[in-house]
Amino acid sequence: MKFVKEIAPYLIIIVLVVLIRTFIITPVRVDGLSMYPTLKNGEILLLKKYDRSFDRFDIVVVKYGNTKIVKRIIGLPGDNLKFVNNKLYINGKEIEEPFLSASVITNDFDINKFNIDKIPDGYYFVMGDNRTNSTDSRIIGVVPSKNILGITDFSLFPFNTFGKVK
């Protein structure tokens, strides 16, 4: 009985940590340069699993095969999306991408490449900020919301990047 009383607090802590990491928040590591310069290779971010209301330009973690990739939501369900002359057009209107550096080049692209006029309900178009070095929706197609693990907008490590991701 004494043993149970001694170990019970530790078991409760372990269960709470497992529940929090499974359903609420968990750390995730950036692997590669596809989000550079916004995020660096090896950076550790906090993934909010509970937040399922995705907005344009949110940084999200996507399950792609057996890996997790960090990308930015560019297109929402119902959007017609294309890039022409390094400019993003959504539903025919030019949209600014303030998070991109002036040197970033985005090759021409049209969502019609996938034989769709607009992004279907429950799907999103994601891209890396480092457009010439990113495996994203231009290659893998639109991403179902069930494959988006959550939003990540807070950097934990390295410590010089600690804080809200812009």
Region annotations inferred by a language model:
Residues 3-4, 11, 19, 23, ...:
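Soluble "head" domains of membrane/secretory-pathway proteins
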Residues 24-30:
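Sec-dependent signal peptide cleavage junction
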